[in-house]
């Protein structure tokens, strides 16, 4: 199946599902990457992807949920009935967010759309919504103005079962959990998905947030899982820079965004571990770094915050990973005891991460490394089709088939 056909098959009018059957709704960061792919097919459809996300997903407080449940489906768990937010909005949504890459995509669409009237109109419409979302992130998740926001659920990282979350997730109590039936393992080999003990804790957090009626202050105080995720914060820092650029282009006041950028740069660079030569997430509850090397540790390059010396150390680290893995970029250091080459975010290559990290290395002048990240991603898709993720040792496609952001980024990367 061609990349365009994947997007067309997964299109549901104004939004695109990540994969037919496995993921039957609209996901936040998926839609951002998918919009990049639509620009190579239909600029209006690319804008519609993002308009649909904000018009149907965003709450009055600016919060942007990680799932918008546009229609009923029995293929996915937990659905809208479990989240319990049906009364808050139609369509229903989840109660947590996801990496905020969308401002970066809006800037690209604004700058490159050949229809300048449409670009100005759509960007002006989306700018206050983006600003409200970023403002919500800082109010709800950085109340002490550190420049770093916390995630309160592994799903918010986008890297759901990363081994970086093992220890903080182990603190989440599993008590009186209602019986449930996962649907993902009916579509995909269970060996390629998160384990049951992970899901028990994911759901325990969900039910806690539901009891707290999704009150941001209550969640911040009471969530036993509170992590400063280096990947989330790097993506937010890049998004802030792009939001600032949009403000200038649209002649909006950029002062508030500039403050976020200044604090964010200081905060993000504080996550650098000098001894390891790498960026680690921070466990806010335990008050310690999470010393597990994952692909998220390369994302500050996408944000543009490291100095050149740190970028060089990250390039050396990526090259070491590339000596152990046939394909870059594994989601976990292939020499790590946590490395599982076929299980979701514990080892496989993900096309969206390759794209962001390649952008970062390119910006820092590591053209050969950026080229390898691109070439490896394209080779995997050429060989295995547009899969959700890929084994970095064998190249075998894993997870969902006909995966939208893989197809979208293949289109975008080869434009």
Swiss-Prot record:
InterPro entries: 6-hairpin_glycosidase_sf, 6hp_glycosidase-like_sf, Glycoside_hydrolase_63, MGH1-like_GH. Its EC number is 3.2.1.170. It catalyses: (2R)-2-O-(alpha-D-mannosyl)-glycerate + H2O = D-mannose + (R)-glycerate; (2R)-2-O-(alpha-D-glucopyranosyl)-glycerate + H2O = (R)-glycerate + D-glucose. Optimum temperature is 70 degrees Celsius. Activity is undetectable below 30 degrees Celsius and above 100 degrees Celsius. Substrate binds at residues 23, 27-30, 76, 98, 158, 193, 344-345. Keywords: Glycosidase, Hydrolase. GO terms for biological process: oligosaccharide metabolic process; protein N-linked glycosylation. It comes from the Bacteria. The active site is at 160 (proton donor), 388 (proton acceptor). One of its GO terms (molecular function) is Glc3Man9GlcNAc2 oligosaccharide glucosidase activity. Pfam families: MGH1-like_GH (PF22422). Activity is not stimulated by divalent cations and not affected in the presence of EDTA. Signal peptide: none annotated. Belongs to the glycosyl hydrolase 63 family. Homotetramer in solution. Hydrolase that catalyzes the hydrolysis of mannosylglycerate (MG), a solute produced in response to osmotic stress in thermophiles, into mannose and glycerate. Can also hydrolyze glucosylglycerate (GG) to glucose and glycerate, with similar catalytic efficiency. Is highly specific for MG and GG, and cannot use mannosylglyceramide (MGA), glucosylglycerol, mannosylglucosylglycerate (MGG), glucosylglucosylglycerate (GGG) or trehalose as substrates. This is Mannosylglycerate hydrolase. It comes from Thermus thermophilus (strain ATCC BAA-163 / DSM 7039 / HB27). The gene is mgh.
